């Protein structure tokens, strides 16, 4: 917890080979500002990795006066001396990757392909996966989950069914790839009669893709293992989506299709658990959720709309408006139990600069009883009442604060209360969009 000068007693861990491996995870329902914290740390990183998800993720980084939008690429790609790794747990839509690299390079980032390593074990997302994603959502009617329609669920489904196509298939015998691709399309057409796929055109396109991406394809498990053996490596793992969207631990079925917690780091990159020591959970000073699903502290009021407007809460991937609510300590505690957070970053504190008072959700009440843990059952979660504490706002602009002591007393008290309630030291405080608008406490 905090020492007398409000500085937590915390020393960044380095292993016996003097490596530093830091994992950045979303500690809410996504859109917490993970990209900004990764970008802040990436200036000193040797390697930045993505371990799961696909281009359903959306990370925004504001650096050097420019805004960058990431979906598949690790945010570290904008650093000139940093290697970016797309791990085996990621599902890759190659047309989306090509478009993203083109946009990033137009924004001034050079040599993306030469800085990128793509796992040969990663599975591919095809256009028909995306079309099927939309059709599945239509079938659900009123029970739709709010998918991004990027084909992520169908791609992970084919992976689990052991009929998916991997990057190594594309790099191998193209006749064999063709046969597998046609069989996969045939299976999808049986399920979705309205599915339209120009098989020959798609195969021609993927043959071109294969030639372009070949130099970037690597056994990333071996690569990362060898880099750790060398020692003195700074490695960042950039989690996508968020722990509350995790397939196993999230608010099922309103979740994504991958493991978004610490387990997904190990399975999505082939990293032994013993290599991980620093796990930074990213949370907004309030909380947001895009798409359907339970949201206990949701503010269906002018206050929620105010957070939405000031915070510019629109999805990077879909453009949908995000629902907003008060910070939820029950969620943060649950995420910590799953992922073992060593610290947290509280972003967008400045969004609440004009509020007379701010609240923090501290407990869930169901049928008059305080719940001891986060409920798995949707029917229970949808009925909980939230117990809040109320704190005075700070009513002043904090966007130029660069030290914790620069913050107004009430803003400091809010951060320290989050520390007290969660039991997790707050390492970073975000007070604006840009990289430098961040207070680092340790």
Curated annotation (Swiss-Prot):
Please explain the role this protein plays, according to its UniProt record. Answer: Plays an important role in the de novo pathway and in the salvage pathway of purine nucleotide biosynthesis. Catalyzes the first committed step in the biosynthesis of AMP from IMP.
Active site at 31 (proton acceptor), 59 (proton donor)
Q: Show the InterPro entries listed in the entry.
A: Adenylosuccin_syn_GTP-bd, Adenylosuccin_syn_Lys_AS, Adenylosuccinate_synth_dom1, Adenylosuccinate_synth_dom2, Adenylosuccinate_synth_dom3, Adenylosuccinate_synthetase, P-loop_NTPase
The pathway this protein participates in, as annotated, is: Purine metabolism; AMP biosynthesis via de novo pathway; AMP from IMP: step 1/2
Superkingdom as given in the UniProt entry: Eukaryota
Q: Where in the cell is it found?
A: Cytoplasm
Q: Record-annotated residues binding substrate?
A: 316-322
Give the family from UniProt: Belongs to the adenylosuccinate synthetase family.
Q: Which cofactor does it need?
A: Mg(2+)
Does the UniProt entry include the keyword Amino-acid biosynthesis? no
- Entry keyword set: Cytoplasm, GTP-binding, Ligase, Magnesium, Metal-binding, Nucleotide-binding, Purine biosynthesis
**One BP annotation, GO:** 'de novo' AMP biosynthetic process
Q: What is this protein called?
A: Adenylosuccinate synthetase
| Molecular function in Gene Ontology | adenylosuccinate synthase activity; GTP binding; magnesium ion binding
- Cofactor annotation comment: Binds 1 Mg(2+) ion per subunit.
